[in-house]
Structure formats: C-alpha cells, structure tokens
Amino acid sequence: MVYNPTATFHKKTLTRMKTGLGSNGDILFIQTRALRDQLSSSFRFVYSNGPFFSDPGPGVLPVYKDAGPFRSWLRRPLQNRAQEPRLHMEAIRKCLEGTMKEDEQSGASGQWVGLMGFSQGARLAASVLFESQRRQNIQEKGGIVRGYEGDNIETKLWDQRWQFAVLFSGPAPLIAFCPENDHLSSQSTAEHDPMYRALDNVNCSGELHITKPTLHVIGVKDEWAPSQRELYEKYCSKESSTLVEWEGAHRIPIESSIVKDLCARILVMSKQADFVES
C-alpha cells in the first residue's frame, strides 16, 4: 500500500493506492500512470476502492463520466454522524484487507511497506500510517493494543510495518482508527465539510505527530490547499516530512519534470525508511 506499494527491495515493494472522494481504483490507475512507469523497477502498485458508493468527486466529470461506480472512504457528514465509528472504521479496514488478500492470492509477493493516496485517500493513507506507528510503539513497550476490532487482535492491515506515505492533496485532520483517539474527527469528510475545524479540537503536538516519512504534494491552485498544508504542518514531524508545491489544482500532477522529481523523492524516502534496494 503506500496508498496502496516494492516488497523487499531485492524484489519489489508493494504500494497501495487509495482513491479520493467520488473516484475509484480504475481512475487512479490512469492518473498515476506516469508515476507508476518510472517506479516500476522498485515498487509495485496495488489499487483499492473505498467501501462506500458516492457521487462523482471534484474533477471526475466529465472526463471519467463512464468510469463508475464511484466510491469514497468516508461518507458525507450527515450520513457519517448516523453511523457508529466502529462500524465505519471496520468497513474501511476490511475493504483494504480484502484488496491485499486478492493481490496475494493472484500470485503477487513482496512486503507491504508504503501508502499513497489522493485527496480523501491521502487523508486515509496518513491516518493508517499514524495508527500503524501508534500500534508499533505500544507493542514495543509491551502494552495492550486497542482498536475497533478489539484488544491485541491481529489483522492483516495492522500486522504490516507501514513505513512511509505519499500524500497527493491530502487534507487534515487525521481519521481515528481506535477508540482511544475518537476525539479526532474520525468521520468528517474534511475536504468538503466546512464544520470540520470545529470538530478537530485535538492538540497534535508530541504523541499525535506522524514521525515516519511523509511526502506531501500540494497544488497551489487547489481550493483545499490550506487544509492540506495543515496536515503537513500540524500532524507530521518536521524532521520526517517533505512538502512539494506545484502550479496546479486538485489533481495528481502528470507533468514530466514534476513526476521525475517526485519519483526521486519517493526513492530517497523509501531508503530513509530503512529499505535498501539491492
């Protein structure tokens, strides 16, 4: 996964790709073609759809009008508040794990190491990386790992050692994947919910920082850029996060010079995460 991910670096690292609101894996596959082509010798990309059906998201129409059905990872705010967080987060986890299992059953091999996402999918990728970091820290201290699935329950998603995330247009805040962090606005569709700032009252200093490597790609013409900068500035450690801004709107860049730079940064970041390609 990185949004979803080369396995061990002597083979390939598996990158999981997560779609944005009102999109799907097929659309993201097309949008990341240039990136995928340049990284194919180091990473294998696996694409996952969100668990919920959705209307087309920003920028999807009219180009991808025939590419439905469209999906989302989070429901709209009014729908969200009617759903128990545990059921919502478990639906996301099972959806991701289903994609991982299908990929492995098809004969794929390699270690899941990174997460990559666009828009709402990037928010999810950052949240999975944070939750993985949280659980690893607790395990190393011999503590009880609590999640919506139960205490100390092994699951495919959380058994992976996620190491880094590539975040295209990813907004704040993080999504809570455990009851202990339910003060995070775990179900707000932040990039389209003007009320999300009132819901996000957590102080993200110290223990709520993502300390694993993250690459934030933000278009300066993106109307949701302020929220995306907040994810970078408020929720990620300055020592391990990198910001790349480009002259674009709410989309994944396809310009060759930008893609080349991003690919180089991703390879450096993967090595920073202690994975060395042989």
Swiss-Prot record:
E.C. numbers:
3.1.2.-
Please provide, alphabetically and separated by semicolons, the GO molecular function terms listed in this UniProt record. hydrolase activity
Claim: 4Fe-4S is one of the keywords in the record: no
Pathway-wise, it operates in: Mycotoxin biosynthesis
Q: Which InterPro entries match?
A: AB_hydrolase_fold (IPR029058), FSH-like_dom (IPR005645), LovG (IPR050593)
Its top-level enzyme class, in one word, is hydrolase
Which Pfam families has this protein been placed in? Answer: FSH1
Q: Which keywords belong to this entry?
A: Hydrolase
Q: Name one GO biological process term.
A: secondary metabolite biosynthetic process
Q: Which GO terms describe its cellular component?
A: cytoplasm; nucleus
Active site (UniProt): S119 (charge relay system), D222 (charge relay system), H250 (charge relay system)
Say what the protein does.
Probable esterase; part of the Tox1A locus, one of the 2 loci that mediate the biosynthesis of T-toxin, a family of linear polyketides 37 to 45 carbons in length, of which the major component is 41 carbons, and which leads to high virulence to maize. One of the PKSs (PKS1 or PKS2) could synthesize a precursor, used subsequently by the other PKS as starter unit, to add additional carbons.
Q: What is this protein called?
A: Probable esterase TOX9
